[in-house]
Amino acid sequence: MSQLAQAFAAHDLKLIEITPVELDRRHWLCVGFEEAGEDRGDFMHLGFLYADQAEFVAAPDLHEAVAGYFSGRDRVLMRLHSECLLGDAIHSTMCDCGEQLSLALNEIARKGEGIILYLRQEGRGIGMRNKLSALSLQYGFRHGQQTGHRHSSDNANLALGHEIDERDYTVAGNFLNALGISSTSMITGNGAKVASIANAGVRIIETVDLWAQDLSDRAKHEMEEKRNRGYRYARYDNDDEEAPARPAAE
């Protein structure tokens, strides 16, 4: 077992594989990992690591290169992204998820270093099957039949017996600790993500505010719901002078 795999195991993670991948003609490293004791099969979490100057692709030992590069590093730019198949892969305009991921990838590449943590948390943790049911409620259907009543995204989850947000980010903090990262700049407006990473002992130097300006009406409504839950998007808020004050995310 490599030193890196041992570090993952020490933080309750199982390191599956590391491989170079090409994203927008740039080489990143994709790290597949699972939570200890949880066999996710093909649905493992993914970490995408970028360090342009490190030349990972030419490294004789990827495990050693990753462990040596990130250990003790400060202000590592990072996006903790929850899976959204419709937004990320199909480029749905119902939400800003795909645009958030694209903006983060581009910003990390521009900076020359960073991490995308891609957690398999479809539908804010309720899974694809339940997400489809929630989307149906949002468009006024139930089991394929028109009901005449449309739910908001949050209320659709509640109507199905779920919490508004069932995600847990412990695994993300464990991942950063396994790499030995000291501090991070997080690309997020979600206070729950910030709090979870901070609770894992990783210092948050700053939060980076990236948001899509050209949103559909549907996506704008999703954004408004998130702001009502305490999300903070400073530039989005400032651009909307009539928006009521939002509670600060802790």
Predicted ranges, named:
Residues 1-250:
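Catalytic domains of riboflavin
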